[in-house]
Amino acid sequence: MMADVLTHTADLRMLQLKHFGILLLVACTLTACAPRRPGEVPALVHAADAQAEVVQTDAGAVRGVAGAQGRVFLGVPFAAPPVGALRFRAPQAAPAWKGVRDATQAGPACLPRYRFGQKQVSEDCLTLNVYAPPGPAPAHPRAVMVWIYGGALELGSNVDYDLSALAARQNVIVVAPNYRLGVFGFFAHPALRGEGEGAYALLDQQAALRWVRRNIAAFGGDAHNVTVFGESAGAWSICYQLAAPGAAGLFQRAILQSGSCLASDSSLPRAEAERGGVRMAQTLGCERSGDVAACLRALPADSVADAKPQRRGLTGSDAWAPMSGGEVLPLPPAKAIANLQHAQVPVLIGTNRNEGRLFAQLLSYIGKLNLRSGYEARLKRMHADPSAIMARYADVAAQSRWDAFADIVTDGGFACPTRRLGQALHTRAPVYAYEFDNPQAPYGLLRLPFSHPLGAYHASELVYLFQRPWVLSGEPAFTPAQQAFANTLQDYWGAFARTGDPNGAGRPQWPRFDGDAPLTLSPGRIGATPDFAQRHRCTFWDAQATLTPPHATATPAQSHSH
């Protein structure tokens, strides 16, 4: 499902949604990803030593599995099913149940626009998974990490990742909620004013964090030591939550991997979002109904999911992003952060050195990036006037248009916007910035003839962080150097989650971000990155950001795959 592979980049219009969908289909075909649900941790659930474990939540008891590898509780409801009269409403409390609820199987993924024949998807999807270390509850509660998956706000689920090793090795509780996708998570219409209009998905994430606050102590976690972390669309989501008043106090730290919400395209003004909603309601046959909201809520879920968005979003035209100017995001995130109206918590933030190569590689399966016509056509989909960009990257394009395209996505969509976000945050709270770099990063897609080297592509750090299969990768086969690096990377993340500082004995010092250069994280080297801004041409992209009119650009994003 490629959920975490295609993320959004806020600073640049990369792919129109029809092309984005084709890329996801290609990726899914190459990975056979539809049936894979690594987060169900079958090796743990079906282990010979697995025993039932019952935990009491505020809605009822749940029965998970405990064994030598860890403890897991899957498919736990954190909100009522958002169906029927609850569609396009803020999440409501999960109904209580009697007896003990089975929690050994994950719930379905939230209904995406592109389903590729997937069977385990549903509009009724607001469940979460809890991964805990083995053994009894500790004397002191454990730090909690809440994972927000990627997928361009259109795809993905909490079972795309096996988070059990992270929980066990770092001695933390990891919680992975689902959240509504696409139209169900971001639809806006004048008939739906209030109740989370245009940002239901962000309220789902907040509801999961409130569930953590109420219930995580029963699983051995510390409700007041919570770190949200996510990649691609997950990082965008966390960036939104930094600017969302309703999320205040729900987390104490944040980790953003390959996602920055500073560009104007990261959210859509209410007027524009509602215009798109009116057009979509017309297409669905509801605009002339006496009760537009009731009509929209009565439609079959598949019909709603399949309808063309009729608006702009993170991936360009006919895509989705949260609405600003409403209850959830009163201000665009960039303005909220500039005005210091954001959560001032410690942040760990970064990107991968070759983010754009994954997108260029996927486009190579359906297009001809090395032809001038194909290259220029793609750039015109990314930017209303690409002439300055083509001129700035003419030296790279003269050698390889494929490389130029990949660099444009990396630099303008990820590296430089993320650096700007770090600059905006670091004067008020600790910021630790990184650039992940690994020329031999494990790769889960089928290698076709004439494949280009992918290097540290988008989402390639995840196999090191989780050290378990995820939707784009099987069981990692690390070299000794890669295994040592994976342990160090995970130790940085775990220490930050526990204390707000990634540093500790036995690993290189990670200085606070000074507004300029991040720390290089690589199996071969952990150290300063003095040439980051120059290599990614950030002077150019920072100037473009100040010149770009609102909502004139967008890009691919996120996925987890997340």
Q: What is the role of each PLM region?
A:
Residues 33-199, 316, 372, 469-489, ...:
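Non-catalytic accessory segments of hydrolases
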Residues 59, 123-127, 143, 171, ...:
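Extracellular structured ligand-interaction cores
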Residues 8-21:
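Bacterial N-terminal signal peptides that target proteins for export
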Residues 180-182, 229-233, 435-442, 508-514:
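Short, solvent-exposed turn/loop segments enriched in Gly/Ser/Thr/Pro and often Arg
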Residues 37, 111-289, 293-294, 309-310, ...:
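Serine-hydrolase-like catalytic core of hydrolytic proteins
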Residues 261-262, 298-481, 492:
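Substrate-gating cap/lid region and adjacent catalytic-acid/histidine neighborhood
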Residues 21-31:
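Bacterial N-terminal signal peptides
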Residues 1-2, 14:
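Methionine residue identity
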